Amino acid sequence: MIKKIFGITALVVFSGFATAQELAVDSVKVEEAAVAAHDDEEGKPLKLHHAEPLYIDLMRDLGARKGEREWNVAMGVTENNGYYELYPLVEYEWAVADRLGLEVEVPFNVYTSAEKLPHKSPGTGVAGIKTSIQYTFLVNKKAYTSMAIGYLNEIELNSFRNYGNGKFFTGNVYNPFFVVAKGWGKTHSISTMVYAGPVFTHHFGSNHVDADWQINSSIHYLIPNSRNFVGLEVNKSITKERFNMVLRPQIRVALNDNTILGLVVGV
């Protein structure tokens, strides 16, 4: 889902074990991968190398292999008229079988100056519990294309200040999605991806359901003989009343065999 965070995001990945910390200014991501993401390893299921966008990431890599896993601890920061909104989160994702990935995420909302909060703003607390599943049903080396389907479910929780004054569970978000990625050119150095699906938000208090479409597209240039890339991610949200779009230029640089740094700017 699209987060309302603008600024620069730094992403660091360590193979073996990693922790990620994402601030609107910088973030760290830690990854433990049991298998490398190359498509030419003998005796292992085919897995193509696609550039995964840095802002809206996947549950697991497309074509994930059993045993891959990753911890993420992140934080987003937004300044709003004299107070700050913090969005820390913790997530764990793993491949329980070849091409099948699961993820559990717990996001938080933290406000630094409660007396300045807008009347309708949520209070500090656990924002919800997200669970998701993703299955890669196509990995075609000849076309250098991978496709996946998945489902994300989020149970929304009441803020700390409203515990005891209302329902503990305030809503539920239903988000089925489809992902397609393709490499272009003789060396597949141009990588494109589309991640799209409807989002239905059920508000338990009013029993009302909001619906919108999220379409996230990206294009990256994979620098030959490296894990580096440069590219652009475009996050779009469409409803009957409005169309929102954020452009996110980004770059990823491998600092060494175990560390990757990614930078994202929201425009």
Language model segments and positions:
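Bacterial Sec-dependent N-terminal signal peptides
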Residues: 1-27
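Transmembrane beta-barrel domains of Gram-negative outer membranes and organellar outer membranes
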Residues: 22-267
